[in-house]
Structure formats: C-alpha cells, structure tokens
Amino acid sequence: MLSKIDYLPPNTALRPAANYLAKAFSEQCDQYFKNPFAVFDLPLKPLGTAHQQKVWSATQAIGVGSTSTYGEIAKQIKSGPRAVGTACGANPYPLVTPCHRVVSAQGLGGFMKEDAPGFYRQIKLWLLRHEGAI
C-alpha cells in the first residue's frame, strides 16, 4: 500500500521504479500529465485523523477543472477554513488526493504547508492550469 507521496525538488536525478507500486504510480502520473482527466487507481494506506479524512474525502469530490474554497469545504463538513487548510497541508497523497483544487476565497491560497510564493505554490498553480481550473 502507498503510504506517502512527495514532490521532488527540481533537478533531482530520476531513477527507475523500485517496485510494482512505484512503477504503477509513475505510469499513472505519466497518464495524468498527458491528460488531466486520467484517474489514479492506487492502494492507499489510510492515514490521518477523522477530520483529515473528511477533508481529503471532500477534495476527492472536486472535479478536474474545478476548485472549491477552504470555506466551502469547511461548511460542507461542519468545520473551519483554517482546519481545512491544515488538513490539506497534511495530505500524504498530493496529486492523488487533489488538495491543490482547494483555494482561498481571496486567491490561490497555500499548498503543502506553504503560504508564500515558492516551490509548492508553483506546483499548485501549474496543476490548476494543467487541469483548466485557472
């Protein structure tokens, strides 16, 4: 089972997938980068608190090319926007569980615990553009 996904920094040397699961993830990423409507089908190891699970489940319902705000997710699961943002920041499966589709009411918002322009927010921006959401 897949327990965590990390984005690699630019210029990281790539190496062949070490096992079946890594190969499946790599192939599914290739499909997603060709077509943002490609579906990830990977065995995920359930992690996180009950609240985090609710947030991550709600993000799964946000379709490709769409976004939802932290406040909208909070209202849906009877929580607060900051708690939703914290749960998104703790998401162990970025890309597969699409927390990049959750945005601030005032704009892009943070991504992977980063709330200032930087590496992860550049990824969020690219993903949303790739999916046609912005």
Regions found by a protein language model. Name each.
Residues 89:
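Residue-level detection of the helix-turn-helix DNA-binding "recognition helix"
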Residues 107:
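Iron-sulfur (Fe-S) cluster-binding segments and ferredoxin-like electron-carrier domains
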